[in-house]
Amino acid sequence: MAKAKKVGARRKASGAPAGARGGPAKANSNPFEVKVNRQKFQILGRKTRHDVGLPGVSRARALRKRTQTLLKEYKERDKSNVFRDKRFGEYNSNMSPEEKMMKRFALEQQRHHEKKSIYNLNEDEELTHYGQSLADIEKHNDIVDSDSDAEDRGTLSAELTAAHFGGGGGLLHKKTQQEGEEREKPKSRKELIEELIAKSKQEKRERQAQREDALELTEKLDQDWKEIQTLLSHKTPKSENRDKKEKPKPDAYDMMVRELGFEMKAQPSNRMKTEAELAKEEQEHLRKLEAERLRRMLGKDEDENVKKPKHMSADDLNDGFVLDKDDRRLLSYKDGKMNVEEDVQEEQSKEASDPESNEEEGDSSGGEDTEESDSPDSHLDLESNVESEEENEKPAKEQRQTPGKGLISGKERAGKATRDELPYTFAAPESYEELRSLLLGRSMEEQLLVVERIQKCNHPSLAEGNKAKLEKLFGFLLEYVGDLATDDPPDLTVIDKLVVHLYHLCQMFPESASDAIKFVLRDAMHEMEEMIETKGRAALPGLDVLIYLKITGLLFPTSDFWHPVVTPALVCLSQLLTKCPILSLQDVVKGLFVCCLFLEYVALSQRFIPELINFLLGILYIATPNKASQGSTLVHPFRALGKNSELLVVSAREDVATWQQSSLSLRWASRLRAPTSTEANHIRLSCLAVGLALLKRCVLMYGSLPSFHAIMGPLQALLTDHLADCSHPQELQELCQSTLTEMESQKQLCRPLTCEKSKPVPLKLFTPRLVKVLEFGRKQGSSKEEQERKRLIHKHKREFKGAVREIRKDNQFLARMQLSEIMERDAERKRKVKQLFNSLATQEGEWKALKRKKFKK
């Protein structure tokens, strides 16, 4: 048996784990949980790590770690209070528990002593008397020792002392007081009322006496004051008092309050009338004026429309009949003579002044209907009134001699004046001939008045077809302006005034106005193109087309990048400066006018116009002799040599001396007769002055361009070499010098490209360095810093990916925890609901069973 036991023991020893024999116990891993990272190539000498992994073990370890940290934070996310153990030495592992307790006790005693015993003076030492504490003796202060005899007197009462040592006087006094109290009996109600009445009467008498004393004192004071006032009758003047006592100045707040208090309140005004209402009122006003004019033209008087009084009957007391005045005069004397003649003269002067006052009253009464302060027809009415007054200022004798003749001639003259007067209402013209017939033969003011009244009588808000009528009127006015421009001499003042009406119509109907302008410009350009195709060249258009281009710049905005009217007008201007040759002085004047229009168009946008610079260069070229200006390059429409290459050269010294600088009139552009030689020379000098002024404006406008000096180079050469001499007038020389200074003052923003004078000598170089081409995908040799940098970048990238992976796993863990909480809550709720239904079912069953028992009974 013993042998068998020994064999079993040996077997157990051999089968025991390695840890029992001193070695560490190694857990047998599940082969299904082992993940082997297979390598594609076996490399000798390489130490492989992580070739075998245990994902289950690492996952369990990570789950346990998250449960201890992340889950704890998640559960305590809504808690704001935390228990902190601040006991001394709690987290110090070097101290033993006994040392911690001793140190804590010492700190507690020290804290207690610092707080409560800081102001006590030796209170820890208890004072004793015969072995007994003094505090206990103070508590038992009623105990009296036999030795303390001095305090016995203080314990006797006053009554006892008076009874024993006062000879009995105290007892007698006490007895007399008792007898006096017995004698005082309570009063009855009647006695109390009488006593109250007596007291009230006594108080009333006292108040009356006080009032009388006060009155006596006030009377006495008044008398004394009157006596003193007589002595103080002499007063100081007010000016001295003002000097002595200055009045305080009112504050800004007081002034503001007074201003607001005394400020006039706003009165309600009439509402603002609409444009349609204003147009209707204007039309009615013009109709009334036209009716008055027709009535005056026919010779009808206002008195004819007034009803005349009928025959007066005997019983008619108020039928328009006025009794005759009593012409008898009172007899009066002055210095002993009668005042008959003076009275007669005064009455005659009054009678002479009465008609004038009546006329003034009539004019003022009718002035409300005929008042037009801003329109020119008011001046015409004043002229007619002046004429009628002059006619009425004839001798009174002639009127007395032939009253019938004077009346007839006055009516005829009034009718003639009204016939010459303009009508107040006009129908819109249906054709250009109608408008021309209305305007021809009239002065400038009358023409403007006719156009204004046509617009007012045919306002679009008055009738349905008035819009189309006014749109036609714009085209008719354009055609009329062209006719005025083609006259010799052109009526430029009327054109200038008509532009205002064209502008108003353009603002009302912009589409029709733009169509009309484009039609006129298109017609002029087609005509010029046809002439170029047939004859090979085309002259500059007439003054009407130039004025149309001028009106275009006034009616429409010229600074837009693209405009349906202004852009074609700019193209038209550029074609005029490039395709029309300069053959005469009229062409020069027209070309300079086109240049002025160009500058007006681009004044705001500051666009560069090469045609403008080329034309000004040609003007300066034809103002210099051919020999002097050789070498300059010109383009069409100018020629370097030819008949008109010296068109603006002035050789007559007398004409140069008599020339005066002035503005160049447009009348020279449409003049049919040829000017004299002196006039022609003056025109040449004026054209040169205008060209220099335009060039100066171009210099100021284009000074900021990078290519400014390249553009102005030929012009500057002509000015410096040929035009700045003494052969021209002083004004032209000053203008030329100012233009040159402006050119030179502009900064050169860029340097032009130039060819190198000689080929540059190359520098001596060393042997070139050969660099091996690096193969992509391999780590090439580099410095230690570069290797360290790459290593850190690789490590940062790896750590970043690992952090993102861990954050993703944390989110998944929290999502699982939240889902488990939700499922637990749902299961708990389901369990409670099920329990509730079970209890209700049990209760229902018991109630039904009880009901069945009752039914059986």
UniProtKB/Swiss-Prot annotation:
It is found in: Nucleus, Nucleolus. Residues 1-13 have a biased composition (Basic residues). Coiled coil: none annotated. Keywords: Nucleus, Phosphoprotein, Ribosome biogenesis, rRNA processing. Residues 354-375 have a biased composition (Acidic residues). Involved in nucleolar processing of pre-18S ribosomal RNA. Has a role in the nuclear export of 40S pre-ribosomal subunit to the cytoplasm. InterPro entries: Nop14. Residues 1-34, 162-252, 264-422 are annotated as: Disordered. Belongs to the NOP14 family. Component of the ribosomal small subunit (SSU) processome. Residues 14-27 have a biased composition (Low complexity). This is Nucleolar protein 14. It holds the Pfam family Nop14. The keyword Cell wall biogenesis/degradation does not apply. One of its GO terms (molecular function) is enzyme binding. GO terms for cellular component: 90S preribosome; membrane; Noc4p-Nop14p complex; nucleolus; nucleoplasm; small-subunit processome. Residues 176-227, 237-252, 272-300, 322-340, 410-422 have a biased composition (Basic and acidic residues). The keyword RNA-binding does not apply. GO terms for biological process: endonucleolytic cleavage in 5'-ETS of tricistronic rRNA transcript (SSU-rRNA, 5.8S rRNA, LSU-rRNA); endonucleolytic cleavage in ITS1 to separate SSU-rRNA from 5.8S rRNA and LSU-rRNA from tricistronic rRNA transcript (SSU-rRNA, 5.8S rRNA, LSU-rRNA); endonucleolytic cleavage to generate mature 5'-end of SSU-rRNA from (SSU-rRNA, 5.8S rRNA, LSU-rRNA); maturation of SSU-rRNA; maturation of SSU-rRNA from tricistronic rRNA transcript (SSU-rRNA, 5.8S rRNA, LSU-rRNA); ribosomal small subunit biogenesis; rRNA processing.
